[in-house]
From Swiss-Prot:
Regulator of chromosome structure during mitosis required for condensin-depleted chromosomes to retain their compact architecture through anaphase. Acts by mediating the recruitment of phopsphatase PP1-gamma subunit (PPP1CC) to chromatin at anaphase and into the following interphase. At anaphase onset, its association with chromatin targets a pool of PPP1CC to dephosphorylate substrates. Residues 418-431 have a biased composition (Low complexity). This is Cell division cycle-associated protein 2. The lineage of its organism: Eukaryota, Metazoa, Chordata, Craniata, Vertebrata. The modification Phosphothreonine is found at T313, T403. Keywords: Cell cycle, Cell division, Isopeptide bond, Mitosis, Nucleus, Phosphoprotein, Ubl conjugation. It comes from Bos taurus (Bovine). Interacts with PPP1CC.
Length: 1011
């Protein structure tokens, strides 16, 4: 009742600051948020509740107002202010929060109800009915008293009639407990922990025999705190420890020793005394009650320890110091199992020294064998058993791994234990086996701690006679030799080291173990080696791929940022994917045409061999190695019309050098594509073959170059020719852009070269033409023309037959011109011809070539000059297209993407040319290098007239090389400009399909050239 009044005061004190609080909201200790406007509404209910709380509330009849809850507590009476505090207060409810008075009283009410239920069972207890113990639990005194009362009330009341002395002692404890526990400031137990522990023990106390070791340890702490008081209070503390439960430190030992525990505390005391574990604690406590305990021993525990009855009093008289030490140890160290065993050992040592009861020591040893062995079993999680527990020495580190037990024998540890004679066991049964671990000696630490489990199990399993029989001289000698090194108090004990040595001496297991080790270690090494090898292989397989992927990503990022990409960067493209059809880049009609091209190439080669014989064989290797061939060889081949053709080529190269440099990459790619397409067009091939025949005759007259100028300029000077065709063009027209004059001849020569290089065009006419060209004189003439024709070969893949003869000469010229790579398709007139070329060719050649062209076809020359001028005047094309070169077999080495700029239609001629640009049609040789794209590997596409930078549409079409070579990257003569400007950065879009008229015109022009 006083507690309620005491609580009302702090509530008022907490509420008092509210009156002094200004207009600012305050958070009270009870958790309520109070604002100035809520003061008047909330103060009165709080005062009212404080008065009502003086008496315990009956929650069956209590109202909301009594608890201080009103509608105002849920509604915020704001004065127009919208502060964040007010907003939060609207969303908050203080009902049910921890620390509120109504919540606290509700908790107390529940506690009282529980206490009332238990009151019927504990009516005799003086303090059980008082609610003060439950209400004012914040003080240490009430916490301790409530704990003990809750734990002992039921048990003590049941046994009250049997032991009046104990009830009196309990009353003494309860009277003195308050004062005694006030002095113990160390034991600051929380209310929750005390109640929860009391509940646990209240449930477990009736069946004390099934108490867990953890509960015993927890209770031991409580009992120790009580026992740690002055000697005057020891009796009360110890009696409570014994009376409360056998769960104190001794109770854990009772369970360990396997002694039967009855519900009565007296029986627990008797069993403890019989086991010699808690005799120390019971001595001080009982004092004059020794006789009573002896009587109880005789009554209760006759079956457990009959010898102990007469020995209880002397034990009590003798073990006062040991009991003190035991209590102190239990206070300092919580693990009671080992400490209790140590106390038992000390007690047994004292008994043995006084020679009072040897039989007791033997009985104690026998009783504790299995009990102490059970403890380490629970602690050890992993055990290796062969039908029974093995000694740790079987698995000892010093012994070899996988030490087998001999067939029919128990673990060696048993024989080692047998080294102990029966008198030794009686003299020091336990203390030798359970000493306090010495952490200084690592080996002894292991020896002292681990063998507990096995040692007792072995002692229990073996008979003394069998032990004596199994002993051998080697064992005793080894053990004696080992005992010399042991401290004198351990002389009678066989250590693990001695057992090890005795094993090694008495048994020949060492050799066997070594053999097993020798076998086991290689196996382990093999396994480890295998694992390492597998890991290394796995790392080799996986890690490089990741690295490659990362590198590829970096490269792709770098490429994507660059607009103008050099073909040299794409040299690694072949390694990434050698199969063009699997490329992620969509290929337009060329993909479908490539198989046809391959078949055509195969057809042309045998046809070429049949028609040309040896000459064909010479040309095929040239196709492959044109780039590698020396320019001097080509110059020798050119011999016939070297002057005329070289002049024209030089002029073309000079004029086209600027274009070739710019359009080098683009034209190479485009021309290679055009070559493939042109191969697919048999009609264009036939026209080209006719043109080549004409050009063959013209080459001899050195006028063919002029007519051939109309052939689309071959930008074979471009980067390294990946494809043999482009390489020949580079080599033959080393200045691949010289296409104007060279292309004029190239139109014919390119047809020949196209046949030579890849035989792209399957033309019987070409074969016939090649037969005509087979003569050396024609070859020489063609060689001079082939300087141009090499470029035209790049542009014209179809005109193979005539080009073969001229290709030999052209290939030589192309090698010579390789030195002058970077040539653009030069216009036949003025600026285009006068464009500076990196090559050292003289401008006089260009002039002479122009003259020749004008002599043969003045119209064609005009067209070429116009186209060249237009291409020079053109600015960089706005649009750019990427072109893939991988599908062309001639360009396999330099696969990749090239930016090509589609040139605007320059003039009627250029527009016609752009129209002629086929989307891979099979008409003419399929490649109109109208754009004068310099692809070292690509053959200049379309007719020789178109290949000429002038590329007049009609006259160019007349040339055999003009046979419509619709290339993906078809571009007008302006393309050389665009290529020079964008240079591999722009891609040309597909223009209109070839007109049939252009084919007719090409045939007509070829007829005119032949005439």
């Amino acid at each position: 009742m006083d507690t309620c009044s005491q609580e009302s005061e702090p509530l008022q004190t907490k509420e008092s600051p509210i009156n002094n609080a200004g207009k600012t909201p305050l958070v009270l200790g009870n958790g309520k948020l109070v604002t100035p406007h809520k003061q008047a509404a909330e103060m009165t209910p709080n005062c009212y509740t404080s008065e009502t709380f003086k008496s315990p509330l009956n929650f069956s009849t209590v109202t909301v107002e009594q608890l201080g809850i009103s509608p105002e507590s849920f509604v915020n009476n704001s004065s127009g202010k919208s502060s964040p505090y007010l907003k939060k207060s609207r969303r908050r409810s203080t009902v049910g929060l921890r620390g509120l008075p109504e919540t606290n009283h509700l908790i107390r009410f529940v506690a009282e109800q529980r206490s009332l239920k238990n009151a019927s069972l504990t009516q005799t207890s003086p303090f059980q009915g008082s609610p003060a113990l439950y209400r004012n639990v914040y003080s240490l005194r009430e916490q301790m008293s409530a704990f003990h009362l809750a734990f002992n009330s039921i048990k003590e009341n049941e046994k009250m009639t049997d032991c009046p002395e104990f009830s009196e002692a309990e009353g003494v404890f309860k009277t003195r407990g308050s004062t005694k526990k006030e002095s113990l400031g160390e034991c600051q137990l929380s209310e929750f922990s005390a109640q929860s522990s009391s509940k646990r023990r209240r449930l477990s106390s009736p069946s004390s025999s099934d108490v867990n070791l953890t509960d015993a340890v927890d209770l031991q702490a409580c009992g120790v705190n009580m026992a740690a008081c002055p000697s005057t209070d020891m009796k009360c503390a110890v009696e409570t420890c014994a009376g409360l439960s056998q769960k104190s430190s001794a109770s854990g030992l009772n369970l360990q020793c396997g002694c039967l525990m009855n519900e009565s505390p007296l029986l627990s005391e008797l069993t403890e005394a019989s086991s010699g574990i808690q005799d120390a604690a019971s001595v001080e406590e009982r004092g004059s009650n020794d006789a009573v305990s002896v009587d109880k021993c005789t009554e209760v525990s006759t079956d457990t320890a009959p010898e102990v009855r007469s020995l209880v009093t002397p034990l009590c008289q003798k073990d006062l110091p040991s009991s003190k030490t035991f209590v102190l140890r239990s206070v300092l160290k919580k693990p009671a199992v080992k400490l209790c065993v140590e106390s038992l050992q000390e007690h047994l040592d004292n008994l043995y020294n006084d020679e009072t009861c040897p039989s007791l020591t033997s009985s104690l040893a026998n009783s504790c064998k299995e009990q102490t062995a059970a403890l380490p079993n629970t602690k050890k999680r992993k055990r290796v058993t062969f039908g029974e527990d093995l000694s740790p020495e079987v698995l000892d580190e010093s012994l070899p791994a996988n030490t087998p037990l001999r067939k029919g024998q128990t673990p060696v540890r048993k024989k080692d234990l047998s080294s102990l004679s029966p008198p030794l066991l009686e003299q020091s049964p336990v203390p030798e086996w359970l000493p306090q671990p010495n952490f200084d000696d690592k080996e002894e630490n292991l020896e002292n701690i681990e063998p507990l489990q096995v040692s007792f199990a072995v002692l229990s399993s073996l008979n003394m006679s069998s032990i004596a029989e199994t002993l051998s001289g080697t064992d005793t000698s080894a053990s004696s030799s080992n005992h010399e090194n042991i401290a004198p108090f351990r002389v009678g004990r066989a250590t693990r080291t001695s057992d090890r040595r005795s094993k090694l001496i008495s048994f020949s297991q060492e050799s066997v173990c070594n053999l097993l080790n020798a076998e086991a270690q290689p196996c382990k090494e093999k396994k480890t080696n295998r694992r390492k090898s597998q890991e290394s292989k796995h790392a080799d397989k996986v890690l490089p791929r990741k690295n490659r992927v990362l590198k590829g990503c970096k490269k792709k990022k770098g490429k994507g940022k660059r607009k103008g990409v050099q073909k040299s960067l794409y040299g690694e493209r072949d390694l990434a994917s050698k199969k063009p059809l699997l490329s992620p880049i969509p290929e337009l009609p060329e993909v479908s045409e490539t198989p046809l091209v391959g078949s055509l190439v195969r057809r042309t080669y045998p046809d070429d061999f049949n028609s040309n014989g040896k000459f064909e064989e010479m040309m095929l290797p040239k196709r492959e190695n044109l780039l590698s061939q020396d320019p001097e060889d080509w110059q020798v081949i050119q011999g016939f019309n070297k002057d005329n053709a070289s002049e024209s080529c030089s002029s073309d190269m000079k004029s086209s050098s600027s274009f070739s440099n710019a359009t080098f990459e683009q034209d190479a790619n485009i021309n290679s594509i055009e070559m493939d397409e042109n191969e697919n067009i048999p009609k264009a091939i036939t026209l080209e073959s006719e043109n080549e025949r004409k050009t063959g005759t013209e080459c001899e007259n050195s006028h063919i170059s002029c007519t051939l100028v109309t052939v689309t300029p071959v930008v074979s000077d471009n980067p390294k020719p990946d494809f043999p065709l482009q390489s020949q063009e580079l080599s033959a027209a080393g200045q691949n852009v010289e296409n104007l004059f060279q292309i004029v001849k190239i139109s014919e020569d390119m047809n020949i070269k196209c046949e030579k290089q890849s035989g792209f065009s399957v033309i019987p006419e070409d074969k016939l033409q090649t037969e005509h060209l087979i003569p050396d004189s024609q070859k020489e003439c063609d060689c001079s023309e082939d300087v141009l024709t090499d470029q035209r070969k790049v542009s014209k893949s179809q005109g193979e037959d005539l080009g073969r003869n001229s290709a030999a000469s052209c290939s030589g010229v192309s090698d010579r011109e390789r030195k002058y790579r970077g040539h653009s398709v030069g216009g036949s007139d003025g600026p285009g011809l006068h464009l500076e070329r990196t090559n050292n060719l003289q401008t006089s050649y260009s002039m002479s070539s122009l003259v020749e062209i004008s002599l043969e076809n003045s119209e064609l020359c005009k067209d070429l000059s116009d186209s060249i001028e237009q291409s020079l005047q053109r600015t960089k094309s706005e649009t750019k297209v990427r072109r893939s070169l991988r599908l062309q077999k001639s360009l396999e080495r330099e696969g990749g993407l090239v930016w090509v700029s589609p040139p605007p239609p320059p003039a009627s001629c250029t527009s016609q040319r752009t129209k002629r640009r086929t989307v891979g049609t099979l008409d003419s040789r399929g490649f109109e290098p109208v754009s004068s794209r310099q692809d070292p590997c690509t053959l200049p596409s379309t007719s020789s007239e178109e290949n000429g930078e002038g590329f007049t549409a009609a006259p160019d079409a007349s040339l055999p090389g003009k046979r419509r070579r619709r290339s993906f990257c078809t571009s007008t003569l302006a393309n050389p400009k665009s290529t020079t400007q964008s240079r591999g950065c722009k891609r040309r879009s597909f223009l209109g399909q070839k007109r049939e008229n252009t084919l007719q015109e090409t045939s007509r022009e070829s007829d005119l050239s032949e005439n």
